[in-house]
From Swiss-Prot:
It comes from Rhizobium meliloti (strain 1021). May play a role in DNA repair. It seems to be involved in an RecBC-independent recombinational process of DNA repair. It may act with RecF and RecO. Keywords: DNA damage, DNA recombination, DNA repair, Metal-binding, Zinc, Zinc-finger. A zinc finger (C4-type) spans 60-75. SMART domains: TOPRIM. Belongs to the RecR family. One of its GO terms (biological process) is DNA recombination. The lineage of its organism: Bacteria, Pseudomonadati, Pseudomonadota, Alphaproteobacteria, Hyphomicrobiales. This is Recombination protein RecR. It comes from the Bacteria. SUPFAM superfamilies: Recombination protein RecR (SSF111304). CDD domains: TOPRIM_recR. The keyword DNA damage applies. Coiled coil: none annotated.
Length: 201
């Protein structure tokens, strides 16, 4: 068994940091050491910001985004086209699409995808909220922007079935060759999807 080199407070910090996605035990140890060394400049302000986030952050009751206000900043932005809703699996997907800056639409966060094998059904996701938003009227288009996985496709089909008969155009993100991608490095499924989604130039 390895000898302890720090007190329980620093060990607890390391253990908690190791739970953050992208940080393993080794990276967490380095991050903790850096924070402790920069106690005044980093650790204090970080602890304060985390406490503030813990107290104020909530889930938007309209779209499922995380923010300090409800409805969130995205939902209350009057410059957005509220008649177009981009449906995403997770808040991280919403943020990624916003960074791309390609559309100025509203969003709806599902909170995952349907996965019967994992026991995740429609009632475990924010699908009912989406159906209610469309049923209220005023939604012209739904862009389903879920991952190109079996679960993502299942979720997209389920949503489409639930909205059958409603006056809304339902589209999906195109799948295929990434910008800067070389065909030789792509898998067969991606190439097949790219061929099916080909466009006129």
């Amino acid at each position: 068994m390895a000898k302890r080199v720090t007190g329980p407070e620093i060990e607890k910090l390391i253990q908690l940091l190791a739970k953050v996605p992208g940080l393993g035990p080794r990276s967490a140890r380095r991050a903790a050491l850096h924070l402790v060394k920069k106690k005044e400049q980093l650790l204090g302000p970080l602890a304060e910001a985390m406490g503030e986030a813990h107290r104020k952050v909530k889930i938007c009751s309209c779209c499922g985004n995380v923010d300090t206000i409800d409805p969130c900043t995205v939902c209350t932005d009057e410059r957005r086209d509220q008649a177009v809703i981009i449906v995403v699996e997770d808040v991280a997907d919403l943020w990624a699409l916003e960074r791309a800056g390609a559309m100025n639409a509203a969003y709806h966060v599902l909170g995952g995808t349907l996965s019967p094998l994992d026991g995740i059904g429609p009632e475990d996701l924010n699908i009912r909220g989406l159906i209610d938003r469309v049923a209220k009227g005023g939604v012209r288009e739904l862009i389903i922007a879920v991952n190109a996985t079996v679960e993502g496709q299942t979720t997209a089909h389920y949503i489409t079935d639930q909205l059958e008969g409603m006056e809304v155009r339902i589209t999906r993100l195109a799948h295929g060759v990434p910008v800067g991608g070389e065909l030789d490095y792509l898998d067969e499924g991606t190439l097949a999807a790219a061929l099916r989604a080909r466009t006129v130039i």
